[in-house]
Amino acid sequence: MESLKDIRDNIKSVQSTQQVMVTMKMISSARIKKAQNAMLNARPFSLGLEGVIDDLRKDILDENNSFKDPDLSKFFKKPDMEKKNIGVLFITADKGLAGAFNALLLRAALNFIKENQDKNIYFFIIGKKGRDFLSRLKQPNVHIVYDAVGIFPKVGYVHADILGEEIINNFLKLDLCEVRVLYNDFKSMGSQKLENQRLIPFDFEIAQGHTEFGEEEHGFLFEPGKEMIFKLLLYRHIKAGLYRILLESQAAELAARMNAMDSASKNAGEIIDTLKVKLNKVRQSSITNEITEIVGAVEALNK
């Protein structure tokens, strides 16, 4: 049977752990409000830019419905799955203690690798958990071309800008059939959804009707030229989409950690209650034994 000291030490240890969990929950709760605001503020810009790009695209396509710059056409063609090179943006957390947040992503990445054994997979990794996992795999067809850690929970557009440059340059240089993105999307405080989406080339023609320019001619003068402006805006659109994805992943991670710490804190409370009951039982048993010994000693003296 455990001694009273052992049980008291266990209670103190669990209480200390519970306090850490409560603190982590409070930190995540405070940060997620900022993350949600940043996420909501990023969406209108991305949608507005989408409409402007669509208007320009219709203006610069030639009679064959193609661009003068062959690189631009690659962003709108259907993926040629006969190509042997494919890219994946893989977004995980830097730390654990976030429930199944990382485990689901790592399993999805492993399944993706198994399903594409015949391809060279070029990974763009955000997050220490993903980088460490893929580095340990040592698969001959898995190549890490870019990784960044420590950007969460303070994601800025500069991170999306750097990431976007890497993805765009390697998409063209390595002749990737497509670039997909694996990440957890924020749905609500209690729900995050694992996403496996195509980033580029675009799944569909850029949506119409999001811009005030409409169909009529407004007589705008473009310098240094429509196609150059279109290319700059297209790259900016990709980076804006990446920024939104990073913000979504950040919010999902914070929500998952907050829920995990809340659950762990409640479990710690239940363990403490159980230990306190056990402590009382041991104390009562100890007192009973002492009383029995005293009574026995008194009876022995009276004989």
UniProtKB/Swiss-Prot annotation:
Write down the Pfam families for this protein, in alphabetical order: ATP-synt
Give the location in the cell.
Answer: Cell inner membrane
Q: Which domain of life is it from?
A: Bacteria
Query: Which key words tag this protein in UniProt?
Result: ATP synthesis, Cell inner membrane, Cell membrane, CF(1), Hydrogen ion transport, Ion transport, Membrane, Transport
Q: Does the keyword Protease apply?
A: no
Q: Which molecular function terms from Gene Ontology are attached?
A: ATP binding; proton-transporting ATP synthase activity, rotational mechanism
| GO cellular component: a single term | plasma membrane
Q: What is its main location?
A: membrane
Q: What family is this?
A: Belongs to the ATPase gamma chain family.
Q: What is this protein called?
A: ATP synthase gamma chain
Organism equals Elusimicrobium minutum (strain Pei191)
